[in-house]
């Protein structure tokens, strides 16, 4: 199962790189969000996709699940949510100001307005 998940992570990484390299600001935001989800999936996969009990000491339980990847992913989800919200607000504001979401046409707009 871990091998299959690694291939899925590779495909998702390729998709996110394709979106990040596009010219639309919304596609770039979707690509970065997809990349963070891919990193979370990779961490879960490397933590082990095995069945086990909660890591609380009880007699008779020999197989525990590692809690560190789960804690890292929970933190990463919160951080990626806040970064995505910031990027969406930034994209909305730049669209309202500049009238486009094309990154290449945004390049010299502010410099041309100053002259």
From Swiss-Prot:
It is a multi-pass membrane protein. The keyword Mitochondrion does not apply. The chain crosses the membrane at residues 1-21, 28-48, 72-92. Pfam families: Oxidored_q2. One of its GO terms (biological process) is sodium ion transport. It is found in: Cell membrane. Keywords: Antiport, Cell membrane, Hydrogen ion transport, Ion transport, Membrane, Sodium, Sodium transport, Transmembrane, Transmembrane helix, Transport. Mnh complex is a Na(+)/H(+) antiporter involved in Na(+) excretion. This is Na(+)/H(+) antiporter subunit C1. Belongs to the CPA3 antiporters (TC 2.A.63) subunit C family. It comes from the Bacteria. It comes from Staphylococcus saprophyticus subsp. saprophyticus (strain ATCC 15305 / DSM 20229 / NCIMB 8711 / NCTC 7292 / S-41).
């Amino acid at each position: 199962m871990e091998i299959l998940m690694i291939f899925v992570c590779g495909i998702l990484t390729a998709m996110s790189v394709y979106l990040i390299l596009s010219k639309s600001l919304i596609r770039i935001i979707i690509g970065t969000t997809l990349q963070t989800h891919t990193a979370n999936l990779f961490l879960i996969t490397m933590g082990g996709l095995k069945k086990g009990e909660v890591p609380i000491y009880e007699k008779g339980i020999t197989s525990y699940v590692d809690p560190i990847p789960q804690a890292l992913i929970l933190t990463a989800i919160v951080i990626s949510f806040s970064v995505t919200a910031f990027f969406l607000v930034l994209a909305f504001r730049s669209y309202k100001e500049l009238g486009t979401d094309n990154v290449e046409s945004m390049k010299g707009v502010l410099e041309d307005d100053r002259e």
